[in-house]
A protein has these predicted regions:
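A short, sequence-level motif marking secondary-structure junctions
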Residues: 230, 344-345
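Accessory, solvent-exposed terminal regions and/or long lumenal/extracellular loops of proteins
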Residues: 238-340, 344
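Catalytic-domain carbohydrate-binding cleft regions of carbohydrate-active enzymes
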Residues: 1-238
Length: 345
């Protein structure tokens, strides 16, 4: 498939596969965890599955958000709990009436996977298919994923250069014993620590924040020292997200799809340490990047002077047809609020 596509097409090839072997990642392949069941325990298993798979050198992975198999009381009538050998931690059987909660939690997890895709045998599978409350939450995370595309696409560039996955187990960044045992948290690039909710009815969960860094609650701006367990709030619309202090996160403007280029990019800086981030851009469609047709921009934060520069130049600037950093948002973790530093356009 890859050879034929390269020979005949100018645009990039993407292959979705569930069969993997060493070296398959060089053929534009993303993998998924097969036709999984819509169960809470199955959602829980997706996290270690993803981390082990990505650690093997296959950086692009996904799952069928919400599960692929039909619900037992809708299409098939099959009782498939027996196939899971009674491993569900809550014993709650997912049915049509309570499925929306599982779908929301799976969707939140999927928004921080290398490949974000929803799929299944359900007749309706749009964000508005599960009620108004669910729609509002799903749209929130869909917009969040799109806003992070400058960050995510730049991570993909680093993966191409180094082979290191950007969805990775905590021990890859923090080689400590506590992190080596964790299977339900992960890093999404150098900045984000993600702690998905995988229990029915759960509104808070324990989260370990690794030592060697300070951490900031993405939703509240609250600052935490590393090397400790905390009890994080996890209401239905909230997946616990923590940002490593000393991070730069490029954020794109709202778009309905990636067919629309994000021409306005702002920087969100989480102070606490000197840091840098390489922003990457190409045409997003062809293989011209293999010929060197791409651009990078080195963003650097000096924590002492509280100054952000790009390739050593003060912001804002025009780069690759984009207006970069007309606004720099520095997260004030001491006062638990955001401080907007607006540069002169």
């Amino acid at each position: 498939i890859w050879n034929g596509h390269r020979a005949r097409c100018r645009h990039r090839c993407l292959i979705l596969s569930r069969a993997a072997y060493l070296g398959a990642q060089k053929y534009g392949t993303t993998f998924w965890s097969s036709d999984v069941y819509p169960e809470w325990d199955v959602l829980k298993r997706q996290i270690p599955t993803a981390l082990n798979f990505c650690a093997s050198g296959m950086p692009y992975w996904s799952s069928d958000i919400g599960g692929w198999q039909p619900l037992p009381d809708t299409e098939s009538g099959e009782d498939y709990n027996s196939l899971l050998i009674g491993t569900s931690s809550t014993g709650t059987q997912v049915k049509k009436q309570n499925y929306a909660e599982l779908y929301i939690r799976w969707f939140q997890f999927g928004a921080f996977c290398p490949t974000f895709r929803t799929h299944g045998t359900r007749k309706h599978n749009e964000v508005w298919s599960y009620g108004e409350k669910a729609e509002q939450i799903l749209v929130k995370y869909l917009k969040l994923r799109y806003s992070l595309m400058p960050y995510i696409y730049s991570l993909a560039y680093q993966t191409t250069r180094t082979g290191a996955p950007f969805m990775r187990a905590l021990w890859m960044d923090f080689p400590e014993e506590e992190c080596a045992r964790l299977q339900d948290e992960f890093m999404f690039g150098p900045a984000f620590l993600i702690a998905p909710v995988v229990e029915c009815g759960q509104t808070q969960r324990r989260v370990y924040l690794p030592q060697g860094a300070d951490w900031v609650d993405y939703w509240t701006g609250r600052h935490y020292r590393g090397g400790r367990w905390i009890l994080a709030q996890a209401q239905m619309d909230c997946i616990p997200i923590f940002v490593r202090a000393g991070s730069i996160i490029p954020v794109g403007e709202d778009v309905e799809s990636l067919q629309t280029e994000q021409k306005q990019i702002e920087a969100r800086v989480y102070p606490g340490a000197d840091c840098s981030f390489t922003l990457y851009s190409d045409d997003g469609k062809t293989y011209d990047y293999e010929k060197g047709v791409y651009d990078t921009l080195e963003l650097r934060w000096d924590d002492c002077s509280k100054r952000l520069t790009a390739n050593g130049t003060a912001l804002p600037l025009e780069w690759c047809g984009k207006t970069i950093m007309t606004k720099v948002v520095v997260i004030d973790t001491e006062n638990k609020e955001n401080t907007e530093c607006v540069t002169d356009a």
